[in-house]
Amino acid sequence: MLEKIFHLKENHTDVKTELMAGVTTFMTMAYILAVNPSILSASGMDANAVLIATSLASFVGTALMALLANYPFALAPGMGLNAYFSYTVVLTMGYSWQLALMAVFVEGIIFIALSLTNVREAIFNAIPMTLKSAVSVGIGLFVAFVGLQNAKLIVNSDSTLVTYQHFKGETFHSIGVGAILALVGVLITAILLVKKVKGGILYGILITWVLGILCELTGIYIPNPDAGMYSVIPTSFISFDFSALGKTFGQVFKTDFSGVGILNFFAVMFSFLFVDLFDTLGTLIGVASKADMLDEEGKLPNIKGALMADSIATCAGAVLGTSTTTTFVESASGVTEGGRTGLTSMTTGVLFLLAVVFSPLFLTIPSFATAPALIIVGFYMMGSALKIEFDDPAEGIPAFLTILAMPTAYSISEGIAIGVISWTLLNVITGKAKEKKISPLMYVLTVLFILKYVLL
């Protein structure tokens, strides 16, 4: 049955590997169950409703990815997009969260149309192989940087933007211990991987979590909610109260457009559209490259199914009551564990569904336990740098700028934009356009990206 659906032998994998990979991906993504409600509740949405909507939207999107594309990619409400939803559209622009959901819903409908007409697939295929490899490396650095932030190893600095965590001080027993445990987690995970222990990333998460529990029981780790450091000891395991979902489900269709100009609405919708489009393409490029799923021409077979799953999930998420649902870069953790088919993503999806019931348990997984996984995944994605033609400056410089932009601009889509603009302009100005056989679509993308920076 599973072999018939997911073609395990054809993809050189087995059930155990796929299940382990799916659990690993879920563990590295589980933080979204806590973070997304926290961010969206700032817009006035009910946090419990958003948690349930997040779980269900993640299940729908990830299950569709498994069935429509047979790829080990998982979906959930995207970070960054949720912050834009709450802090920009609602709190800064003053629109209702219902209108923001409608913008997300319309964006999803447009994406379905673009996926059916091969526009998104054409954009994916138009990006040169060098930039695709650079995107993979850039995402690796981005994911590792997110891991360092989640572990509180890297923190804000007024003078240098970021700095390392100072372990001494009044927050030592919360932030300091958490950061130290994250470092221990990186070491444990690295040792397991060097020893070729199957499921090393997952075991690293679990061992770090257990160490956190022991530290809390002995008073070494003291929860400090004000600093974002919560108890890591589960106090309850299940909850069957789903009534809160009614506070967000279907509210997208009750949007009040009075006082909202059509141009203003489409400006909001386009922002969601742009970021989601290139974040998704970037993630698919990066993770697929890591899994050696791209063919000789740099194309991803059956990409239409993957894009359709992403599009439908965005619409479903808006109806349920959450911001844009998109393909997650944390999928790379499951790929690193050997995940190669939709059985990996189906496993992750089912765990998101179970999370609706077991949310109290999953919400206690600390960020310092999952952060080591993200850091190690970043290391694994560095391998794509070997495919970049650094000896050709016309290829190497745009690739470098792509890699540099993603962690520093904190955006996958910005990295792609800078890479596309620099690659096209550099090759055209130096007379290499014919030699490189630049796709007409690359010219279109370059113009659109430049207009974006000029007008938005």
What are these regions (language model features)?
Residues 1-49, 165-168, 205, 209-303, ...:
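Helix-loop-helix hairpins and the membrane-proximal interhelical loops
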Residues 2-36, 57, 78-87, 91-139, ...:
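Helix-loop-helix junctions within the multi-pass membrane cores of secondary transporters/permeases
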Residues 12, 16, 184, 266-270, ...:
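Alpha-helical membrane-protein architecture signal
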Residues 19, 39, 123, 199, ...:
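Residue-level signature of catalytic and energy-coupling elements of molecular machines
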Residues 44-63:
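Loop-to-helix transition at the N-terminal end of transmembrane alpha-helices
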Residues 47-48, 73, 97, 412:
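Membrane-helix interface/capping residues of multi-pass secondary transporters
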Residues 61-74, 190-196, 271-279, 310-320, ...:
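Transmembrane alpha-helix interface/packing and boundary motifs in multi-pass membrane proteins
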Residues 93-210, 346-456:
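Membrane-embedded alpha-helical modules
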